[in-house]
């Protein structure tokens, strides 16, 4: 808890915010629970910081290897998340991978055993196929803007990445739309749904 408090203080200070909002606090409260998370929220709600704080709270300096993977639908979002991480996660090795970026440069960065990887589905899948990303130590998987990933046609790449991951301890799926069903390959474990869509001031917390 002491480490989490320090993480929150550092994030607020470096991002020039006074305190966490309700969504961010609720996300952190789920960090040690065994349930996976479905976070439904609109753009500009503080979603990125909400899941990044949870991810960072679970990273251990004692483990060598990739502990967290954040999959996003676009280069722009990958760079945005990478920028936030650079401000709040000093000392943690982070690699950002996306189409249009130098594969050679990414490969060199991946060779130094990052703890956290952010990237787009196609580029992440390609690095995995070539053995540049190994996910045997993966603890936390984030599928950010999952609805957009599907809308952009990344279902096959995402299934290729996610289906083999049998030992991931926590999955976080974010979306701006609510759906009654999810592709089977997500394989969420007793997910808790945090719903911040619409005009609600507080979330609905629904174990499903």
Residue ranges and their predicted role:
Residues 205-208:
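Conserved interdomain hinge at the start of the Helicase C-terminal
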Residues 5-10, 63-129, 137-140:
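Conserved nucleic-acid-binding Ia/Ib motif block in the N-terminal RecA-like helicase ATPase lobe
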Residues 33-39, 64-68, 114-115, 169-170:
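Pre-Walker A (Motif I) flank of P-loop NTPase domains
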Residues 44-45, 122-124, 147-148:
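Short glycine-rich anion-binding loops that position phosphate/pyrophosphate groups of nucleotides
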Residues 25-37, 48-63, 79, 84-88:
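Walker A/P-loop NTP-binding motif
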Residues 134-202:
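Post-DEXD/H (motif II) to motif III coupling segment of the RecA-like Helicase ATP-binding lobe
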Residues 40-43, 73:
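P-loop (Walker A) phosphate-binding loop of NTP-binding proteins
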Residues 1-40, 144:
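Conserved pre-motif I regulatory segment
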